[in-house]
Structure formats: C-alpha cells, structure tokens
A protein has these predicted regions:
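Flexible low-complexity scaffold tracts in large eukaryotic assembly proteins
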Residues: 144, 148-149, 154, 170, ...
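TPR/TPR-like alpha-solenoid repeats
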Residues: 79, 114, 153-154, 184-196
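TPR/TPR-like (Sel1-like) alpha-helical repeat modules
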Residues: 52, 158-175
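Long C-terminal extensions of eukaryotic subunits of large macromolecular complexes
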Residues: 191, 196-234
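N-terminal pre-first-transmembrane soluble regions of secretory-pathway and organelle membrane proteins
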Residues: 1-147, 151-156, 174
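Polar/charged alpha-helical tracts
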Residues: 43-46, 187, 213
Length: 234
C-alpha cells in the first residue's frame, strides 16, 4: 500500500485512500494519465504494480475487481514495453493471475502482439495453447481473436505448420472460425509451407504481406498501443 502512495507522490498527485474499488479506479486513471499523457512509464508501471498488490482484500467482495485487475495489467504491460523490459511482461502477468488459463482474453491478445512485434512469438506458444484448450475460455469474449493471433503471429511465423493445420481442424478452430476463415487460415499455412520449400533461408517476406491482408479481428477490444511503434523495440 505504501508503494502505491509513493508512486502517486512522485507523479505530484495526492493518493486517494484505498477503501474500495472507486479509489482503485482513480488510481487506474492516474496510471493511464502517467502512461499516455506524461510518458512517465516507470511511475505508471509502479502505480499499476502497487494497485494490483492492494487489490487482495477487494477481490472477494467487489465484482468490478476483474475489470480493474485487467486494466492495471494492460497499462503495466505497455509501460514495461516502453521501458524496453518486454522480457518481463508475461512473468509479471503470471504473478497476478497464477494460471495461464485464467488470463483475460484481451491481455492474451496484447501479450501475443507484443511478443510478435519484438520477434519472440515462442514465448507465448505454450500459454496460448493452454488458454485456448481450457473449456471455460471457449465462450469468452475475445476467444476468436486469441485463436487468430495464435495462428497468424505464433504458429505460422515459427513454422509449426502441422500444429497450425491441427488447430484449424480442431474443436478450437471450429468454434473460433467460420468455414471461410478456416479456409483462409489453411491458405496462409500452405503459403508458408510453399515458401519454406522454395527459399528455406528467407521464407517470410511475401507471407508477411499475406498475413497483413488477413489481420486478426480484435473487434475493437485492442487498441494498438504506443509500444507497437516504439523505437526501443526494434
């Protein structure tokens, strides 16, 4: 709790008393302002981290807790990325969710996109597989987007083509994609296979253009954050 006060003091704000979700909403707003307006990424992250730690007692008594927790995590992820600390992102998320299948869809989407952007899609492979195969996530908002991102930004770039085909044909694929989308996905996979045979050293350039033509449909859940173009990530 003192960490939360300290982080807000550094931002020049008077810390609200931590007596419920309304105060944590103010803290979340402060973190967002620090991140987006002031560009104070370290203090924004510290505010999110402290806010998450302060939520322990609230979790059992307020149904807004899940939304607040996700909000702190999403801002914290972006702040870490801006600080060029993207390697810490998923382990930090797991400190607060403990089980991979419990991570909200919008956070999975953000993590997949980040690790794809920095050229480390393998980091999210196992977590995405576990998440998609958890029965309680099948009906979750954003399930289809996680499946699309996993296919296009993890399996295909890694060259795991057989697993990509299996995903499309599996129960997950049937739930996530329409018949037309499944065919498009298979076309992308076969294009990757063809390019790998023709030029094993550099199969990805034309495929990247094809993937860009069929982006994952996040349906407005994800707004592409500043870190996607941050110079430190190149």
């Amino acid at each position: 709790m003192n960490r939360l006060y300290d982080s807000q003091a550094r931002s020049g704000r008077s810390p609200p008393p931590l007596s419920g979700s309304s105060q944590l909403c103010q803290t979340l707003d402060s973190a967002a302002e620090l991140m987006m307006v002031h560009g104070d990424f370290q203090t924004a992250f510290d505010t999110c981290d402290a806010g998450l730690e302060s939520m322990g007692q609230l979790e059992a008594e307020d149904n807004r807790c899940a939304e607040l927790k996700a909000g702190f995590c999403m801002i914290g992820i972006q702040a870490l990325a801006e600080l060029n600390r993207w390697r810490e992102v998923f382990s930090w998320v797991m400190q607060h969710y403990e089980h991979q299948e419990h991570v909200p869809a919008k956070i999975m989407q953000l993590c997949i996109l980040l690790h794809s952007k920095v050229g480390a899609p393998a980091v999210m492979q196992e977590a995405s597989r576990v998440w998609l195969n958890c029965p309680s996530n099948v009906g979750a908002s954003g399930f289809r987007s996680v499946a699309e991102l996993y296919l296009l930004h993890v399996l295909v770039p890694l060259g795991h083509l057989e697993e990509a085909r299996e995903l499309v044909a599996s129960e997950v694929g049937c739930v996530a994609f329409t018949e037309e989308q499944r065919q498009t996905a298979l076309d992308v996979v076969e294009e990757k296979a063809r390019q790998s045979q023709e030029d094993p050293k550099n199969p990805g350039d034309a495929l990247d253009a094809k993937i860009a033509a069929h982006p994952a449909s996040t349906q407005g859940v994800l707004k592409f954050p500043p870190f996607m173009h941050h110079k430190n990530l190149h």
